Amino acid sequence: MDNNNFIHNLRLPIIQAPMFIVSNARLVIASSRAGIVGSFPTANCRTLEALDQSFSEITSALGNGKNSLPWGVNIIVSKMYARSGDDIELILKYRPPIVITSLGNPKQVVEKVHEYGGLVFSDVINLYHSQKAIDAGVDGLILVCNGAGGHTGDLSPFAFVSEVKEIFDGIIIVGGSISSGESILAIQALGADLAYMGTRFIATKESDASDEFKEMIINASAKEIIKSNKITGVNG
């Protein structure tokens, strides 16, 4: 992947967001071949052997190094995630073009991924976490805004993007209720480079979601959304 021009070479400015339980190697490959950035979380592979197999499948299909189509892997860098060190070792073995960090300081990942020429994006929910990621040397910030699925944010993209652009000149990605061309154009008008789109891909044939869940997603509306702090979240 050409780090300097990969965004311009995309068919649409979208990262297919990594979703727990849902995203897999098949979805990554299909997304990247369709002209966007496919990604998946390492935690979806319950064993290191399964993660190694997924990496092997993806690199065989999408290529390696500068000849690779754009794709990424998401790793939890929280100290509570016991497997992060082993996951990083496999990342260094297969060298995905983009590594997305979540729920912790990305510094150790940045240093190692930059050694092989990869890009590191960090997902953030506020300016405090944005500054920590910037100080760690990330190449891009994923602004997880109000309306994002999973570990959601509270800020409106109208406020978040403009404030981040004052302190960061790298790649800006925005997530949160983006599911159409109109919403992609809206975040581009704000100054974002890429859309972080997840829910739209749950109902694809490649995803690991059950058929019943896919049907529920297709038929759901805003009234079904529940926001809770009772399961997991982001420390301050």
Segments the model singles out, each with a brief description of its role:
Residues 154-170, 179-236:
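Conserved active-site-proximal phosphate/metal-binding subdomains
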